[in-house]
């Protein structure tokens, strides 16, 4: 078997060769210096001078100090990449001193180098820096993935995200957009007098959502603690304390399964506004998401594609955040997407059970009418909500923290926001009646005792806070990861989390 047939042998040989070159650099006192300071980024140079002619550049006598990772070596040209883009360096074999030329011979793909010199244009019209005093800043001991194939193993892209970011411009752009999304949300809210808060990640009582928590132990306090599943109850304590507009962008943790839409550690924005209701937050959310799309993408039209196994685009859909968002109640949406049904089929237990059974939904004895309606909704409606849509009036049975509707106590003043068949946000007018909240907590405790690991705990301190009086308030949570998935046309949540959770590799 030749070396070309065994990648492991090839890589070991390359690593040995690179270690030898590093040894020579150490002997010369040139290993891992930290005394170069660039004055230009690649993309900035391309933007400012890329359209200049050779003659214009020579006349302008522009000089630059650049640094980056070697991505290609083509004869006398070296292509480097920094955080903004790429530019070429030119090795002037006649103009450089012999000692510097010898050092350049120690360069390999993946090394981090630096140089200064005049800007020129090649005969092909490419911008380059005519290197003076070329420097090897970091010797890469391991080779980069094949320049044509890249890091093709999806799982390895997640495990070795640093290589994915080096070799995959699409991945870098995804995380630039993610950063811009968070930045624009923060800007939008702070400009509207919201205060950013930080609430506990370790909690004695995990609350604010129905989910299974991660359990840990605090040795000094000698108590069991939980990684938070949501910041909600602490943020509402702040509303009680007088912070009438408050938000938090941070991680939540839920000890549940992995999927293309679920990661046990994920990022959310939660925000609360006193003297507002769920309709006010729907208006705010519509305005904010329109702003975020424009800021992050430069457009309110979000393109998503479907691809075949070869990666070819076979279908495309545009989610239009520029148009007014659709608004329907849970019941209206069920009837809209199931035209064969009537209101009489789903507004009573017998009818709803019959519909659910016909859909193959396994019923549980503890379910009431509201829970069955939601199961029908999730089975027949949720995945069909493609354009930006608010679904409102969720049953009280499945909304333990939301305020009951004044006209119909069977439902709450709650909405969820969907686009592309995905739930992105959940918001409602907050329940601020301490006695009603205590009763709902008791029902959750009963469900937990009956075996529901995701049911809520009874949070007595939160009830005490409500007894001091929380103003009429509306609150909302938006899943940052799912929002970024949508905006970047990413099929998996792992594509938008820098270091997603993975099963350990087998020995």
UniProtKB/Swiss-Prot annotation:
Parts forming coiled coils: none
State where Mg(2+) 2 binds. Answer: 423
Cofactors needed by this protein, per the record, are: Mg(2+)
Give one GO term, molecular function aspect: magnesium ion binding
The reaction(s) annotated as catalysed by this protein in its Swiss-Prot or TrEMBL entry are:
tRNA(Lys) + L-lysine + ATP = L-lysyl-tRNA(Lys) + AMP + diphosphate
Q: Where does Mg(2+) 1 bind?
A: 416, 423
List the subcellular locations: Cytoplasm
Sequence similarity: Belongs to the class-II aminoacyl-tRNA synthetase family.
Q: What is this protein called?
A: Lysine--tRNA ligase
Q: Which gene encodes it?
A: lysS
């Amino acid at each position: 078997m030749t070396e070309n047939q065994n990648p492991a042998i090839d890589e070991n040989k390359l690593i040995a060769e690179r270690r030898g070159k590093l040894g020579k650099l150490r002997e010369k006192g040139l290993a891992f210096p930290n005394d170069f300071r660039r004055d230009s980024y690649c993309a900035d140079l391309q933007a400012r001078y890329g359209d200049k002619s050779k003659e214009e550049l020579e006349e302008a006598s522009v000089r630059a100090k650049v640094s980056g990772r070697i991505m290609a070596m083509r004869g006398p040209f070296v292509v480097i990449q920094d955080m903004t883009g790429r530019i070429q360096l030119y090795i002037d074999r006649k103009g450089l001193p012999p000692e510097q030329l010898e050092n350049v011979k120690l360069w390999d793909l993946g090394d981090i180098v630096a140089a200064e010199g005049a800007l020129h244009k090649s005969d092909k019209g490419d911008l380059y820096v005519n290197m003076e005093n070329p420097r090897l800043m970091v010797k890469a001991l391991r080779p980069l993935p094949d320049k044509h194939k890249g890091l093709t193993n999806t799982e390895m892209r997640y495990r070795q995200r640093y290589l994915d970011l080096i070799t995959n411009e699409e991945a870098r752009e995804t995380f630039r957009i993610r950063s811009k999304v968070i930045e624009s949300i923060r800007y939008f809210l702070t400009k509207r007098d919201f205060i950013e808060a930080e609430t506990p990640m370790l909690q004695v009582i995990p609350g604010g959502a129905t989910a299974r928590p991660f359990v840990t132990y605090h040795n000094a306090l000698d108590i069991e603690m939980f990684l938070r599943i949501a910041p909600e109850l602490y943020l509402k304590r702040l509303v009680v304390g007088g912070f009438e507009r408050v938000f938090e962008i941070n991680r939540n943790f839920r000890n549940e399964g992995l999927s293309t839409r679920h990661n046990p550690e994920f990022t959310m924005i939660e925000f609360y506004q006193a003297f507002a209701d769920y309709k006010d937050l729907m208006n705010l959310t519509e305005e904010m998401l329109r702003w975020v799309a424009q800021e992050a993408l430069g457009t309110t039209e979000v393109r998503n594609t479907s691809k075949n196994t070869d990666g070819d685009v076979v279908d495309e859909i545009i989610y239009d955040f520029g148009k007014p968002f659709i608004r329907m109640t849970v019941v209206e949406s069920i009837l809209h997407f199931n035209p064969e049904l009537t209101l009489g089929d789903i507004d009573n237990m017998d009818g709803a059970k019959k519909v659910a059974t016909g859909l193959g939904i396994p019923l549980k004895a503890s379910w009431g009418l509201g829970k069955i309606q939601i199961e029908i909704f999730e089975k027949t409606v949720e995945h069909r909500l493609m354009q930006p849509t608010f679904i409102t009036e969720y049953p009280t049975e499945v909304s333990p923290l939301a305020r009951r509707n004044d006209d119909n106590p069977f439902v709450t003043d709650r909405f969820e926001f969907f686009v592309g068949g995905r739930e992105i946000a959940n918001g409602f007018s907050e329940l601020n009646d301490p006695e009603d909240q205590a009763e709902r907590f008791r029902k959750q405790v009963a469900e937990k005792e009956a075996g529901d690991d995701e049911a809520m705990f009874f949070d007595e301190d939160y009830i005490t806070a409500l007894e001091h009086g929380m103003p009429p308030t509306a609150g909302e949570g938006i899943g940052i990861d799912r929002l970024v998935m949508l905006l970047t046309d990413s099929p998996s949540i792992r594509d938008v989390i820098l270091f997603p959770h993975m099963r350990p590799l087998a020995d």
